[in-house]
């Protein structure tokens, strides 16, 4: 393969020099990178909100709400992201639901939000279901309502337990933003190909785009790992504080008013005489 690339001139130095020109970055790569980050951040935030609401609705005590959320989750998890983007693009364009300049962006965010939100909902539902049932029962026994139990007891633990899966889903959302290329959205892959069509360096352009995506994924993973460490440290501090008694132990309270020096091996019991009548 290397010899074939060498024969086609794809490994020549002049194929890589355009990336040393600031104009290549300001014209193609940086606008595409901004488009990728903008779509990914918007869709991840909306997917987290949607996934939380659907996940809680999936475990609701209201049967109709459980069925409704379950239908939404299973439907949008089964549809490919690209089909969701194309459907949203045609829907928004036909009924003029969004401005024409934001049409591709809205379609990309819609597709990523609906798919990843459904997956996140199932992740949260599984995380809550994996917690011991005794925690819910204890909270209810203490007088907490179902909503208080879910938001204050179950949901924080489920998020902490399922954080690696949530991080993986965020990375998937970031990479799937490249599918917006099919509906004309300007993101980093499309910008890289546009740059390659001008400079005739497709291999170099795709390699640079791949490095950019890898760096973004590493940064997202590092941020999530830092958040996870802070969550674990916070739980550890709370456990330590919970185990420290509020008052020091004062020893045994004897009923017969016996003072005992437990430090002296030859201690003697000294009894205080009771009140004389």
Swiss-Prot record:
Transmembrane portions of the chain: 37-57, 67-87, 103-123, 153-173, 203-223
InterPro entries documented for this protein: AA_ABC_transptr_permease_3TM, ArtM/GltK/GlnP/TcyL/YhdX-like, MetI-like, MetI-like_sf
General function of this protein: Part of the ABC transporter complex GluABCD involved in glutamate uptake. Probably responsible for the translocation of the substrate across the membrane.
Species this chain originates from: Corynebacterium efficiens (strain DSM 44549 / YS-314 / AJ 12310 / JCM 11189 / NBRC 100395)
GO molecular function, one term: transmembrane transporter activity
Pfam family, one: BPD_transp_1
Family statement drawn from the similarity comment of this UniProt entry: Belongs to the binding-protein-dependent transport system permease family. HisMQ subfamily.
Keywords from the UniProt entry: Amino-acid transport, Cell membrane, Membrane, Transmembrane, Transmembrane helix, Transport
Membrane topology according to the record: Multi-pass membrane protein
Protein name as it appears in the record: Glutamate transport system permease protein GluD
